[in-house]
Amino acid sequence: YTHVLVGPASVSLLKMKFPKRAHEVATEFGYPMYAEGLRRALDFLAPLGVPIEITENGVADANDTLRTEHLKRHLWVLSQAIQDGHDVRSYHHWSLMDNFEWAEGYSMRFGLHHVDFETQERTLRPSGAVYKHIIEQH
């Protein structure tokens, strides 16, 4: 969930730039971290009266420096929305482990587990331990 600032330019959709505001933190993908976008999406969908499942919410972060904050912000916004009556049935972080991204190949690291693509060894990242703790408590 992010927002897009637009202006005149001639670019391919796959090579779009996502400018950030001065107070925003950008992910390695170039998207601003925007937890409020999750709440706005839930508020927009609420009138439909259908159960919601969040199936992909994550951040490209090879060094795992942003993912914990991303998780905390988004899960806090999600918990507030649920307390306010939104019928959210599930949340699935993107992704359990680093994987192949269709447009970016193996260059973007979304996983709660680091994957060494040469050996296939998987290692839990600190953000994965934080997520584990959060879901154990709730």
Residue spans for each PLM region:
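Non-catalytic scaffold segments within catalytic domains of secreted glycoside hydrolases
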Residues: 1-138
